Amino acid sequence: MATEKSVTPTEEQLEILEYNFCKVNKHPDPTTLCLIAAETGLSEEQTLKWFKQRLAEWRKSEGLPSECGSVRD
């Protein structure tokens, strides 16, 4: 498995990612993730990694365990 270099999203990419995280869905399904990746120009893997890290950050800020399952599960 090839590992991708860590890529820091640009300000424009971050705006798209944050908008989708805050206003659309904190748990994007594979199709939505693919669309977000296409919109940002990031790979699906990079986009998924960003969402996972951002979700852990959000959970921490809310006083929730960073690794807990979704209430939707």
Curated annotation (Swiss-Prot):
Matching Pfam families: Homeodomain (PF00046)
Gene name for this UniProt entry: HOPX
Cellular localization per UniProt: Nucleus; Cytoplasm
GO biological process terms on file: cell differentiation; chaperone-mediated protein complex assembly; heart development; negative regulation of cell differentiation; negative regulation of transcription by RNA polymerase II; positive regulation of gap junction assembly; positive regulation of skeletal muscle tissue regeneration; positive regulation of striated muscle cell differentiation
Entry superkingdom: Eukaryota
Organism in which the protein naturally occurs: Gallus gallus (Chicken)
DNA-binding region (UniProt annotation): 3-62
GO MF entries: DNA binding; histone deacetylase regulator activity
Cited SUPFAM superfamilies: Homeodomain-like
One Gene Ontology cellular component: cytoplasm
SMART domains, per database record: HOX
Function: Atypical homeodomain protein which does not bind DNA and is required to modulate cardiac growth and development. May act via an interaction with SRF, leading to modulate the expression of SRF-dependent cardiac-specific genes and cardiac development. May act as a co-chaperone for HSPA1A and HSPA1B chaperone proteins and assist in chaperone-mediated protein refolding.
Stated name of the protein: Homeodomain-only protein
UniProt keywords, alphabetically: Cytoplasm, Developmental protein, Homeobox, Nucleus, Repressor, Transcription, Transcription regulation
